[in-house]
């Protein structure tokens, strides 16, 4: 019979031990490169959650934020990261909505508010908390310098700990990794 009364620390210890054993078998898997190119609230979570999870597994992680993905690490991320129900046909809505209704003014704000509320109810970390976890975990958050130049962003407009580099510099880092994700 499966013991469901195992404490959280025991589970974490077992997972760490299993991951460490796997990494020792294949040390090339110790590096991950993630490219984040989308700048909406629902697309902000995957690169931050995956990068912090990879770091927790002992991997060296670099996340390259380019184009609208820069919104994720911009100081003004709270207002920049929104959800568009029009662009998310699979988004669960509490009340079925005709597609045309999603284009009405105010629907983006309502969808954003609903998603934040769902995350709060399920105790999902906020984006700012994930920034902090990433920094503390040693995840390299890298903003694309070319995209910053195109959009007119300055380095002081980004959250603490963000590095700035071009695509060639990031690719030099990414080519040494075993895992590369484009989000």
Residue ranges of predicted features:
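Residues at the starts of beta-strands that form the adenosine-phosphate
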Residues: 31, 60-62, 140
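Glycine-rich loop at the start of a catalytic domain that most often binds anionic cofactors/ligands
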Residues: 73-82
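A charged, amphipathic interaction segment
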Residues: 108-169
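A glycine-rich helix N-cap at a beta->alpha junction
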Residues: 81-119, 123-126
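Heptad-repeat coiled-coil amphipathic alpha-helices that mediate oligomerization/assembly
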Residues: 7-27
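Short internal beta-strands
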Residues: 61-67, 144-145
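Histidine-anchored nucleotide/phosphate-binding helix
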Residues: 45-58, 63
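Short, glycine-rich nucleotide/cofactor-binding loops
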Residues: 34-44, 118-122
């Amino acid at each position: 019979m499966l013991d469901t009364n195992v404490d959280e620390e025991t589970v974490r210890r077992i997972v760490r031990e299993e991951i460490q054993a796997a990494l020792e078998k294949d040390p090339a898997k110790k590096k991950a490169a993630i490219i984040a190119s989308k700048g909406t609230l629902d697309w902000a979570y995957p690169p931050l959650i995956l990068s912090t999870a990879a770091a927790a597994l002992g991997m060296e992680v670099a996340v390259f934020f380019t184009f609208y993905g820069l919104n994720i690490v911009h100081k003004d991320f709270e207002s920049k990261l929104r959800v568009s129900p029009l662009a998310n046909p699979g988004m669960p809505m509490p009340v079925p909505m005709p597609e045309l209704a999603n284009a009405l003014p105010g629907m983006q704000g309502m969808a954003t508010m609903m998603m934040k509320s769902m995350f709060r109810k399920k105790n999902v970390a906020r984006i700012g908390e994930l920034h902090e976890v990433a920094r503390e975990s040693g995840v390299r958050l890298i903003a694309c310098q070319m995209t910053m130049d195109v959009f007119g962003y300055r380095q002081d407009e980004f959250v603490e700990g963000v590095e700035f580099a071009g695509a060639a510099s990031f690719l030099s880092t990414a080519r040494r990794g075993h895992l590369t994700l484009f989000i």
